Amino acid sequence: MNKNINKANRLVIGLIAGLLLVSSAVAFANNGGSFSFVTARPQINVTLAGMIERDSEKLSLEKVDAVKPGEVLHWTIKSENEGDGAAKEYKAVGKIPAGTVFVADSAKAEGKAAVTYSIDGGKTFSAQPMIEEKQADGSVKMVPAQVSMYSQVRFEWEAPLNPNEKLNAFYDVKVK
């Protein structure tokens, strides 16, 4: 019986507290105040722009009909936070298009960003992807993957991308 009274008392106290909270909010709003719950969120606008250099002239890939083997394409990933909250642990990923190969040491970013690479279509990323290589004696050894095996490049910034801030990342690929 004593347990039932305790439960009933807790229920009554909870209901009273809830009513006080609701009535306080209504009174505040009726007195000209505003009452809202706002959650700040990032809203990232990402664009990818490509450029090629021909005859010492830089051309947008949008203005080029075709690319030729041996030409280097310069990619820029532009990220802008148009929201009202910071994007923490922000990452941008660039794909290595079919028919091209990543140019070693070409990945750069504004700000302090870690650069990692994928050789499995973006499932995993590593600063130095490794593959298994069968040795002459039949054993298997882990060795660095060839740059030609890279399928994606990822940029991960240490600092958050704050509202109204922009970040750019760059990488090059060579047409096969």
Indicate where each model-derived feature is located:
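Exported/extracytosolic protein signature
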Residues: 2-16, 22, 26-176
